[in-house]
Amino acid sequence: MAENHPYDPNDVAACRSVLVEALTVLGKYRDRIAVVGGWVPELAIPGQGHMGSLNVDLALDVAQFPPNVYETIRSDLLAAGYTPTDIPNRFERKVPGNPTPVRVDLLCGEYAGERSGSTHEMVQGMAVWKARGLDLVVWFHTKIRVSGTLPDGGRNDVEVTIPTIPAFLCMKGILLVDRKKDKDAYDVYFCVANFPGGLKALSSDFQPMLSNNLVQEGLRNLRAKFSTIEDIGPVWAARVAVEAGADEEFARRDAFEQINRLLDLLKIPKHGQPA
């Protein structure tokens, strides 16, 4: 069964409002918190028709936080109207006029703290979800500004750290192996198709990162998942692109061709070929 993508503009606007508010509430930690996940394409390449996201993912640079900060983060979120959920690292924020609460997840990379088989990192008494590939935002990031109206009113403009587009693509490449979510493939397609300066500029931005093992893992995964026009990468990307007004057949072929041209420029072996 195809995944449903209910990206109602009101829900997206509510989520952006919560994104700006969460970054406002946690402003004193802005140098140690990054926005990751589905908002990155719209924030990094605005005005090109990306649909945004319905949840907020915040990656915490665990190594850079002094003692007792995590309890302060939790307290700050609770005081601002965020409610905890049954999932330890997840909060929700109700937005006036919108029936669906916005989800806010606190995440960290696998190498941020103690190595264990647990899905969560317990830091100063607060659970943070460990996600493979998130360490890339600590190593390869940029700063931008994002503005919006807060849920309770008033506009604000805040500085935020996001992964570079090359890092983001590798993070999504890792996720394409770990879960089934059509929008992961769409986000890859959108960033590659709309990168300022085109594929050669994007390839150039990748060059300083290519010796990194997580980068190589993500790129190899992209090669595997976009190996043919029938693979899940192009198919999932096209399903979501239709919601943005694209022709599904064109989007599927374009996603396949663009991602593979990029991977050719980066000299990533064809799927099934030795490295």
For each predicted feature, which ranges?
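Compositionally biased terminal segments of proteins
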Residues: M1-A275
